Amino acid sequence: MELGVLLLLTFTVGFLLLLASQNRPKTHGHLPPGPRPLPFLGNLLQMNRRGLLRSFMQLQEKYGDVFTVHLGPRPVVILCGTDTIREALVDQAEAFSGRGTVAVLHPVVQGYGVIFANGERWKILRRFSLVTMRNFGMGKRSVEERIKEEAQCLVEELKKYKGALLNPTSIFQSIAANIICSIVFGERFDYKDHQFLRLLDLIYQTFSLMGSLSSQVFELFSGFLKYFPGVHKQISKNLQEILNYIDHSVEKHRATLDPNTPRDFINTYLLRMEKEKSNHHTEFHHQNLVISVLSLFFTGTETTSTTLRYSFLIMLKYPHVAEKVQKEIDQVIGSHRLPTLDDRTKMPYTDAVIHEIQRFADLIPIGLPHRVTNDTMFLGYLLPKNTEVYPILSSALHDPRYFDHPDTFNPEHFLDVNGTLKKSEAFLPFSTGKRICLGEGIAQNELFIFFTAILQNFSLASPVAPEDIDLSPINSGISKIPSPYQIHFLSRCVG
């Protein structure tokens, strides 16, 4: 459904739902200031047509780093700036550890799974997931070994193209997905596997749709738009198809389950289900399993692959940066072995470039919504229990109080005067606090090895001149996606 039709529908039926909204429970407490809302419509008139992110950044200029907006009929507290976000998610971590609702995903996830659960369910699932992923990441085949094996497959695959022009989207999706698949499903897939490619396409479609303006309008008025056609229906359809695959995989795991040798996340979860089958209140049931696997598969694939796509688009835009990275690679690693994680500390410029790519790309500008778990005093305001809170991660990644030129790509943001890697409290691409991304460590390891392995083995070329390359994202709502592009990977000859 087109955005204009959605908005017309909103205004047309708004007065009907205004009657229903009068029955909603009134909030107590003292929320931060913000623009005056209209009944039911909330702050729709203050929303920028270019999306929620642009709207929030404009409101920050007027109201400061903490303010309230009404997304349709519901109040949401917006947190901007590094210090404010860290004050909430780190200093008052427990109070802000609840998970808010993502309307376009809720019909499928319904508060299940490690990412979208709340309360004891979330604590139990997160503890289990952290331990399980750590065990499979640090066991006989560590995550580093898995990534290095995948990097070798990647290099061999790119060499098959012999420098021909290609769109790197599919292959970057494949390598990222194979790492999380090896941990969750216990297997990797061939890059040409049709079922695998179908799953990756569904993930890519869904991530793109979530960043669309229509999806953002749905977040405002999901209460009645859910009854009409729109992007939310397509998102649910896509996710259900992925869930069907996960269900099938779970049944295969169940049929071959060996209690003595669990080989992946699903096996380990099934064993825990069996152990707790007499507990009628257990959180280890089928629904939490499949939604947890869906969440890990989705986030473990799309964020890393999109970062890699941005990485090489940026390198095409700034070829002098790529050349400087390659010089460091040649000095530290050479050409006769793959990069290892131990190399990272000896390669501060490369590490700084990867940090700056993540900062500049800003893939998830509006972090997943939080919810306060109790009535909470925050910076002089009283947030009632269950108040939704949006941390605007983009406002930290582009915080002028921490980065001299926040809107410019500059690896020097992460280097001190001695050329050593410089940490920054504003570096929050994975959020922070108790809800920080489960796979942060794995993702950082993937980015270093994949990025370095490619530049070790290939020079880059584009049919577009560097000055004409556009780094602007397609969407700038709850996700940012680079425009599709073509690239040559040309084999390097290094002595």
Swiss-Prot record:
Required co-factors: heme
PROSITE patterns (alphabetical): CYTOCHROME_P450 (PS00086)
GO molecular function annotations of the record: arachidonate epoxygenase activity; heme binding; iron ion binding; oxidoreductase activity, acting on paired donors, with incorporation or reduction of molecular oxygen, reduced flavin or flavoprotein as one donor, and incorporation of one atom of oxygen
Stated name of the protein: Cytochrome P450 2B15
A Pfam match: p450
Membrane topology: Peripheral membrane protein
Organism, scientific name: Rattus norvegicus
Similarity comment: Belongs to the cytochrome P450 family.
